[in-house]
């Protein structure tokens, strides 16, 4: 028999600076969903995901899954009272969030709010009346009790459309945004809660871009509406979205954000959780599955394993990665990527773009090219930053040095753009470049880069950076003999830069780097690299489209 001793690391030094961290605290008063998608369980996950400390007061023990509510077992009034007393006596509480409330819970909470007076925490009320599955979670008089006893104390009320109708005591036709405004204003009067968030998930709208969701925040004290337009996700898996949104808003308020900021943050968090989704139900569950509350949470062990000073190698052995290169036809990962069904449509749109053709024949309007140069300048600054991050994640000195070479090349590209703006477009203001604003296409691209750099590994980050060089050189080399822009013009000079022998050599090095990436990446995760390449090619095409459409 053998044994070994594994030394446990102390907290990372920087994290240790936050020892005895003061966490914002949120108390959830709601029923349970033992399947984890809604109720108190969803609240605790959401509050934790926002780096807040979650406390609970369970109003009912429910036998519930995304399929339906099988039974509701209300917590006795005296137990609810004891739980609230204990929590409010011994624990700090920045925000209270309510979900499913029973008659007993409403009466107890009403008494506590009166007792607390001006010292009461902020209150976010999600008037849970019906589960997403359609099951009733409240008696017919609960709506009136919430209106009378709880809502007047609330900082914000977050009903969906059906819940608005129950609280108003009548159904209404919703055919335009103004109808939702009227619902919000009338609800504020009836409930005596000045801030109302009407959730629009039940009534998606349509425009030229397709379906979208509109949530409306009414700020009564300011007599102002804020509409939040979000993407419509074509999914039926939305179990627990209401609970999650209210808890996210409560957590943001606990962290000191303003109400509009807190609502925005909550909406985006929920939409991300819906869009990313999770596979946790059995195949028999076809509709109303849970959302992914933990999409932004890091796995502690992954950080430990990536720590160069990790001390527990005896306990955790890294499996050697089997190369996938021998499975790639022709031995070129680059050619495999650009011909992959997921990548090819975006690659073709990118390298055959009209922007390149218009630059090549000199027909592009100067203002559009100036816009491109300005946006590309900001893009290259971000590209350099991301390359530095890639270098910091690289496994060896050789790979780090490659990123430093790339940064130097980017610096040269920035100098060329500065010269073009100065000589071709008469820009003399030395602060001009600092005043340029990112357009929507560039914002989307930079957001993608920043997210991969924050969450991805070295291989994934290199894959994200690769299409820029490969696509430009491919596109300009392809039409090298068709360039008719005037000799000495900025258009011809730009075309000749990317069709030069130097850029072609850099492209060959990029192809070698892609093969190196494939040799060191887990084969079972290959689709991740393919998806990243496809999405970045689409972003590149959109970047050129933005220049063509600039007015």
Curated annotation (Swiss-Prot):
Any one GO biological process: thiamine diphosphate biosynthetic process
Binding positions for 4-amino-5-hydroxymethyl-2-methylpyrimidine per the UniProt entry: 64
GO cellular component: cytosol
One GO MF term attached to the UniProt entry: thiaminase activity
Listed Pfam families: Phos_pyr_kin, TENA_THI-4
Domain of life: Eukaryota
Pathway(s): Cofactor biosynthesis; thiamine diphosphate biosynthesis; 4-amino-2-methyl-5-diphosphomethylpyrimidine from 5-amino-1-(5-phospho-D-ribosyl)imidazole: step 2/3; Cofactor biosynthesis; thiamine diphosphate biosynthesis; 4-amino-2-methyl-5-diphosphomethylpyrimidine from 5-amino-1-(5-phospho-D-ribosyl)imidazole: step 3/3
Keywords: ATP-binding, Kinase, Nucleotide-binding, Thiamine biosynthesis, Transferase
Catalyzed reactions per annotation: 4-amino-5-hydroxymethyl-2-methylpyrimidine + ATP = 4-amino-2-methyl-5-(phosphooxymethyl)pyrimidine + ADP + H(+); 4-amino-2-methyl-5-(phosphooxymethyl)pyrimidine + ATP = 4-amino-2-methyl-5-(diphosphooxymethyl)pyrimidine + ADP
Expression induction: By absence of thiamine.
Cross-referenced InterPro entries: Haem_Oase-like_multi-hlx (IPR016084), HMP/HMP-P_kinase_dom (IPR004399), PM/HMP-P_kinase-1 (IPR013749), Ribokinase-like (IPR029056), Thiaminase-2/PQQC (IPR004305), Thiaminase_II (IPR027574)
Keyword Hydrolase (UniProt): no
Cystine bridges: none
Function, as annotated: Catalyzes the phosphorylation of hydroxymethylpyrimidine phosphate (HMP-P) to HMP-PP, and also probably that of HMP to HMP-P.
Family, similarity comment: In the N-terminal section; belongs to the ThiD family.
PANTHER family named among the record's database cross-references: HYDROXYMETHYLPYRIMIDINE_PHOSPHOMETHYLPYRIMIDINE KINASE THI20-RELATED (PTHR20858:SF17), PHOSPHOMETHYLPYRIMIDINE KINASE (PTHR20858)
Protein name (record): Hydroxymethylpyrimidine/phosphomethylpyrimidine kinase THI21
Source organism (scientific name): Saccharomyces cerevisiae (strain ATCC 204508 / S288c)
């Amino acid at each position: 028999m053998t044994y070994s001793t594994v030394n446990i690391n102390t907290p990372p030094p920087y994290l240790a600076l936050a020892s005895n961290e003061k966490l914002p605290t949120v108390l959830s008063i709601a029923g349970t969903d033992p399947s984890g998608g809604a109720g108190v369980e969803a609240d605790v996950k959401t509050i934790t995901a926002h780096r807040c400390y979650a406390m609970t007061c369970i109003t009912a023990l429910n036998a519930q899954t995304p399929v339906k509510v099988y039974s509701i077992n209300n917590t006795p009034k005296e137990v609810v009272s004891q739980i609230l007393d204990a929590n409010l006596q011994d624990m700090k509480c920045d925000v209270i969030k309510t979900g499913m409330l029973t008659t007993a819970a409403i009466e107890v909470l009403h008494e506590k709010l009166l007792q607390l007076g001006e010292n009461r925490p902020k209150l976010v009320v999600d008037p849970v009346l019906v589960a997403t599955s359609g099951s009733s979670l409240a008696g017919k008089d609960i709506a009136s009790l919430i209106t009378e006893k709880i809502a007047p104390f609330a900082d914000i009320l977050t009903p969906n459309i059906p819940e608005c109708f129950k609280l108003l005591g009548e159904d209404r036709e919703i055919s335009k945004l103004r109808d939702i405004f009227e619902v919000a204003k009338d609800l504020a009067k009836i409930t005596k809660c000045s801030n109302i968030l009407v959730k629009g998930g039940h009534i998606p709208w349509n425009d030229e871009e397709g379906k979208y969701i509109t949530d409306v925040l009414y700020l009564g004290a300011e007599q102002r509406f804020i509409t939040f337009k979000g993407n419509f996700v074509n999914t039926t898996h939305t179990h627990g979205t209401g609970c999650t949104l209210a808890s996210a808003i409560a957590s943001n308020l606990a962290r000191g954000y303003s109400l509009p900021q807190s609502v925005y943050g909550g909406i985006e968090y929920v939409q991300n959780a819906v869009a990313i989704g999770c596979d946790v139900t059995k195949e028999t569950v076809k509709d109303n599955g849970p959302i992914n509350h933990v999409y932004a949470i890091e796995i502690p062990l992954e950080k430990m394993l990536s720590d160069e000073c990790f001390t527990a190698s005896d306990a955790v052995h890294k499996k050697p990665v089997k190369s996938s290169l021998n499975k790639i036809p022709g031995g070129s990962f680059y050619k495999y990527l650009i011909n992959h069904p997921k990548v090819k449509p975006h690659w073709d749109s990118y390298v055959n773009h009209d922007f390149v053709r218009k630059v090549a024949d000199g027909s592009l309007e100067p203002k559009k090219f100036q816009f491109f140069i300005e946006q590309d300048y900001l893009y290259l600054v971000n590209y350099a930053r991301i390359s530095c991050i890639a270098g910091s994640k690289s496994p060896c000195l050789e790979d780090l040095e490659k990123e430093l070479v790339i940064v130097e090349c980017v610096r040269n590209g920035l100098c060329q753009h500065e010269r073009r703006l100065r000589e071709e477009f008469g820009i003399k203001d030395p602060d001009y470049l600092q005043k340029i604003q990112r357009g929507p296409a560039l914002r989307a691209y930079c957001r993608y880069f920043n997210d991969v750099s924050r969450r991805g590994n070295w291989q994934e980050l290199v894959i994200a950076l690769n299409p820029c060089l490969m696509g430009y050189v491919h596109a300009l080399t392809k039409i090298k003999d068709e360039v008719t822009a005037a000799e000495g013009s900025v258009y011809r000079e730009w075309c000749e830069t990317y069709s030069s022998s130097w850029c072609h050599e850099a492209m060959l090095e990029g192809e070698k780097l892609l093969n190196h990436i494939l040799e060191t990446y887990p084969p079972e995760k290959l689709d991740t690299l393919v998806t990243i390449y496809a999405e970045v090619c689409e972003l590149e095409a959109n970047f050129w489209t933005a220049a063509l459409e600039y007015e």
